[in-house]
Amino acid sequence: MTSSDSSVNTTSSSFGNISISSPNHSSSTPPLNNGNGNNVSASETELKKHVLYSLQCLDEKTLTLKVKLDHLNKLVELKKSIPDLNKLGISPTQLYKSVRPFIALPPKTIRTAGLRVMRYYLSNSNNVKELLDLKVQYFITRSLERDKHSEPERIQALKIIRTIMEIDCSLMPHCFVKGLVSIAENQEDNFCRVCLECLTEISIRNPQISSHCGGIRTVFDAVLDPFYQGIQESLLICILYLLSDKDTRIYIRPKSDLEIILAPLTNSFNIGVKLKGASKEKEKEKEKEDEVAMKKWTASSKAVLTLIKSWIGIISLNSDDQGLKSVVDTLRMPQIELQEKALDSIFEIFRVQLPKSIQETFGPQKATQTFNFGSETLQDLPSRTRSLRHNLLNNYLSVLLIAFIDNGLIEGLVYLGNYVANRDGMSEQEKECSKNISLKSTVLLAELLHMSNALLPPSQCAKLQTLPSLVNSAISFRLDPRLRSSSNTMVTNLHSYSHNKSSTTLMDSTLAIGLTGANKWRRIKGQDRRLDKVDDVKMKMEWHMDDNQFQQKIKDTQVLVTKDYQKWSWELMFELLEGPLNNPQHLSNTLKTKFIKRILSFLRPNKKLFSTMAWTTENLKYVRTACVALEVLISHEIGFDFLKDNKTIIQIADMLKVELDYNIKPPPSSSSSSENKKDNVRLLNPEKVLKTMSREYFTMLGTLSSNLLGLEILARNNIFDYIKPLAELPGRDDLSHLIMTSLDYNVNGASRTILQKILTSSSRVVRYLATKYLRFLLRSGVQDFSNWGVELLVQQLNDVDAKVSALSLNVLDEACDDPSCLEVLIDLKPNLLKLGKPGKSLLLRFLSSPKGLENLLQNNGFVEQEEQLWITSENATYVNAIESAVSESLSPSVWRFKEAPDGSSTSGVYLPPHFFGELAKTEKGCQLIRKSNNYQRFLKIIQDPTAKQLDKRASLIAIGHIGSSVDGYSFVKESDTIKLLIGIAEKSQCLALRSTCFYALGMISCIEEAQPIFNSFGWESPSDLNSRILLPKDLKNSTFLSVPQYQYQGSWADHSFETLPSNHFSDPIKNEIISFVGNLSSHITAEGASKNLKRLKIKYPDHFATSEILNAVFILLNTFKYRLGARRFIYDLFDVAIFSSDPYHDLN
């Protein structure tokens, strides 16, 4: 209760988008409330006296309305001190009877106050029943349906309806819902939005009454209305809730209700079509129609996208003959604009991003292509081990694929790819647009083929990959030559895109080296076998290159001809360093020339050539060649001897020393001139590090640190003695980051020591970035990470900054996918429980190791307590969390790569550790599960028809986790669980339960022993069982994506209502009045009926003033559907009866 409710006339109050204000009012009786809003203590006796006195005053006929208004406001104040009227010995019915007359009086201020009192004294179901037994609902509905001049009254009426809805929606009267429907359908009314929202909530709480009153149909209609664009998603959530379970699904008309949403998608053939010979007025009218139709088409498209982002939506749309097929058929619309919008929607559905340039997508790839991996790219290196975890989004995408393919998506994309060839008479602009659409459809088709290869079983993949319709049109000479040519082009583009996609992937999960030094500039092997072969053959040929050829190539570089580096052929230099110079003989001969000397001379800091260049993409070719040259030299003893005392290395060491000396002993502030001179000497001051190539000297040092000979050179020149303090300099985060990301950590030594120092830097930012870099090192497969990296991560758990600690915990969680890292972590015994729920989640990983389980069993009953916790609550919390994560990740805003505060990727939904799943990974853990009989408990729950859906879903996930390990699968095999789960997935009346069961089946499908059983039931998995995906072999013969047939029970005509016989009254005039009131419900007869009713009221005013006829009118309003204007007209006709001395007489 807010202060604005304390008096009918106090200050301003608001509801939704509606704000009201009333004049001030002073109460004649002091309220039981002080100025600070704190209740003044009063005994129950005094409270009872106050209440009874106010009720007595309300019943007193001689008192003025102003006095009675004061007592109505006083009752509101008194309620703040009265938790329950019955405790005072006062019946709520007594109060409602005293207040009831005031909501049927002409002054709206009095009506508003009466409504407020009623609302305040509604606290339980009994109160609601007592109130409704007094038939006040008709007058509350009238107050709700008043015009804009009665907003305070309408707000109080709406609040009463919401209060009843929240207390017990099963008691909701029909007249309330009818009133809400009439307002929600009238967009000119200020309350239409809030009434629609109430209607949506009632549809969830009490779908039966909403359906009988037309509320659910109103919700469906509003989905496509541009006026309700802001709440469209809420409306669709309501619809999905109703579709989910058999008990609520019966209130939605099979197929026809969903087709309200789908209709605009395929009924828009006339949009944009110009009328020949039409007048300007007709053209303007057509433009307006097209605008409205386009808005509905867009709303329909968005609605379908929202539906498809849920399992309930996919199953419901696939069950409807026109569901997903309507979405696919939009690709065949004649309007190019609609084709493109439809294509973009399908890109969004499958979470596929369009390339920045469609045209360049199909360009040829060069075998000699090289790539630049900056430090930012390195941070986003994909996980080497994450692919082993179950990504729930892959299950979702696999079902989307088979459902859309079954509904003709591939044929639709092929049609779009050949669209230009199928049309004559197109303008140049249309042809250009169509060509773009054709290329986009080819990209999407290629992406789907690529996706299906990973997510679909081989049998389904084979049918898809052959593309029979496209291939047939490409090779058939009976078809139009243009179509054949277009099909050939599409086939070529598909091949090109598929090839380019694999060859341009910079990194993959098989990467086994840290990308430092020269490795930053090489194409990663294993991405493209064709390019790998080309490189191997080329390297062998260059290795065995004869001396004459080699000497000629050396000359062609121009290095021996001129000292001007701009005239050198840097590409040829790079090729020589990568190839022939790896041959010791060629290297030995070259070192006798000035080739290597001039390259290293160019790199000397003091030369001010390389060191002062701008740090640009174009200039990175120099550091690329420099790193490869250093790598070649430290790979051979002769190169080592040449490099160990080279001036370039000495000058790099001096450069580091200058920077270190400056920061340790900065010049006095008075000597500004000397400071400027020293600043010019410094190549590593912040500005130069940011803007010049001097920063790349650290990359070269990283190359040297990757090899024992290189490390010896660094030690010989005391470079590590300079790097260590530079990495810890306060205020030089740039140097810390450069040093950290440049050094090589594959060799145990000073590099790892420096990284450890950086991890304990005084700068929070540096510590965070260093911890994040440990994730990169883990993913890149750096040598012996488990032996040193895990310990560093455990050290970071104690960081004072919560973000650093959370990040290290997240990286440790990922590291534990590697058994060796998990074993090291178990030995370190970190205190993970102090880190809250994420820490406990990581601790659960210990259960999957015999050693870890043994440790936890000795930890003061941790396992037993956790087991009990998971049985009572955590199982349910877990399933809610993962399903919410799936729902959230399907939101468009997170379809692109994002990083969470803990540094983790949100590009997938990976299953977190589950207590029973981790326990089942060891033999001892399985013994504990068997001893506690928990598996049998889960089986009983999923078979119990009276069990809650949440408990069933939680049990399904627990079964899936237990059955996903080799040891745990024994439980599945013993109890014939697979048959039970497939039965639920295919036949459950609860669609949400099917989706959870689908996930559980996917978990178990990673066990090879289970595959024959799945095959016997008509289900199969992709070749890679680690994908944890299980799909029906034939979707048409499976009921997995089909809603069971049901009988619609939402029609009001099929249910008994309070109705009137045709001759209800003995007086024919009254019967005629009632007949015309009934005709107002039809827009066909409404105009004539309203004229006749006006005529009859003038002629027989007394017939409109009795409570008897008012009762009959309320029955009609409660039975039939009237528009808001008609309802207000009816209330005005019978206002005398409504405001009579006893309007409740015949209602009672």
From Swiss-Prot:
Please, which domain of life does this record's source organism belong to?
Answer: Eukaryota
- Main location as per UniProt: cytoplasm
**SUPFAM superfamilies referenced in this protein's UniProt entry, alphabetically:** ARM repeat (SSF48371)
Q: Name one GO biological process term.
A: establishment of cell polarity
Q: Which residues form the N-terminal Ras-GEF domain?
A: 803-914
For bias type Low complexity, the affected ranges are 1-34
Keyword annotations of the record: Cytoplasm, Developmental protein, Guanine-nucleotide releasing factor
Q: Which GO terms describe its cellular component?
A: cytoplasm; cytosol; TORC2 complex
GO MF annotations in UniProt = adenylate cyclase activator activity; guanyl-nucleotide exchange factor activity
Q: Name one Pfam family in it.
A: RICTOR_N
Q: Where in the cell is it found?
A: Cytoplasm
Specify where the region named Disordered lies, as residue ranges: 1-41
Gene ablation phenotype (knockout): Cells are unable to aggregate on bacterial lawns and show impaired chemotaxis, rounded morphology and lack polarity. Phosphorylations of endogenous pkbA/PKB substrates greatly reduced including loss of phosphorylation at 'Thr-470' in endogenous pkgB. In null cells neither chemoattractant stimulation of intact cells nor guanosine gamma thio-phosphate treatment of lysates activates the enzyme adenylyl cyclase. Constitutive expression of piaA reverses these defects. dagA and piaA double mutants require both proteins for reconstitution and activation of adenylyl cyclase.
Q: InterPro entries from the entry?
A: ARM-type_fold (IPR016024), Pianissimo_fam (IPR028268), Pianissimo_N (IPR028267), Rictor_IV (IPR029453), RICTOR_M (IPR029451), RICTOR_V (IPR029452)
Please give the family membership noted in the entry: Belongs to the RICTOR family.
Quaternary state and interactors = Part of a complex, TORC2, consisting of tor, lst8, piaA and ripA. Additional proteins, such as 14-3-3 and heat-shock proteins, may also belong to the TORC2 complex.
Extract the PANTHER family matched here: CYTOSOLIC REGULATOR PIANISSIMO, RAPAMYCIN-INSENSITIVE COMPANION OF MTOR
- Role noted for this protein: Regulates cell growth, chemotaxis, signal relay and the actin cytoskeleton. Required for chemoattractant receptor and G protein-mediated activation of the 12 transmembrane domain adenylyl cyclase. Functions as a part of protein complex TORC2. TORC2, is presumed to be indirectly negatively modulated by rapamycin and regulates actin polarization. TORC2, but not TORC1, negatively regulates phagocytosis. This protein and dagA protein CRAC, a cytosolic regulator, are both essential for activation of the enzyme adenylyl cyclase. This protein and CRAC do not function redundantly.
Name listed for the protein in its UniProt record: Protein pianissimo A
**Which source organism?**
Dictyostelium discoideum (Social amoeba)
